[in-house]
Amino acid sequence: MRCVILRKDIALARMMPPILRLIAILLSVALFDASWSTPAKTTDRTSLAGPLLVSSPSIADPHFDHTVILLVQHDHKGALGIAINLPLEERPLASLLEKLGAKDLKATGNVRVFAGGPVQPDIGFVIHSSDYRQPETVAIDKRIAMTSSRRILQDIGNYKGPKKYLVAFGYAGWGPGQLEAELERRVWFIAAGDFKLIFDEDRDKVWESAYSHREEDL
C-alpha cells in the first residue's frame, strides 16, 4: 500500500491539521527565485524515538523509494519530516543568496540542494548543527536543529552560519494517525538520528546505513 501524503493544493491546505499549518508560517519561496520569511518558533518535540524514518525496500510509493526522512515534528495531530538523501543539484552559494535578496556577501563554493519531500517543493528548510541558533530555530535534538529564514543563508554566505547544514525544499507530511498506521504496516522503520549520517555520509549510502540500524520494534 502506498504511503499517504498530503496534497499541496491551497484548498486542502486550509483543512490541514495544526501540525501541518507549521508550513504556513515557515518560509514560502520559489526555488532560487524568491525571498525567505521568518517562521514562528516552536518547542514541540517528536514523540517517536527516531528521529529518522527509513522507508521499507518494498515501499509502493515512488516518491519515497529508498528514502530517509528526518522527523522534525510528530504528535497526535500529525507529523512532518524532511528527506535527507535526495539531492537535486549543486548551485553556487553566492548566486543562490543573491537571488534570495542577500547582498554584499563573500560566499564562495557551491551548496547542494535536496528534495525534502513531494509536498510543497517551493518551501525551503535548512537542517543544521545546533552550534547555530536564531529565535526562529527549532531544536530537533541536542545536536540537530532546523531554521527556515533568509538570515541563515546570509550567515552561511558570510561564514557565520552552522558548521554543518543541509538545504532542502519540500517536505513529507502525515495527518493524524497516518504515520502510526504506516509504521505498524512496516512501510517505515525508525532509526536513531545519527549526526554523521545526516550531514557527512555519502548520500548514496544513507539509506543502506540507516536501514541496517533500524529498530524492529517501536
Predicted segments with their positions:
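Bacterial N-terminal signal peptides that target proteins for export
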Residues: 6-23
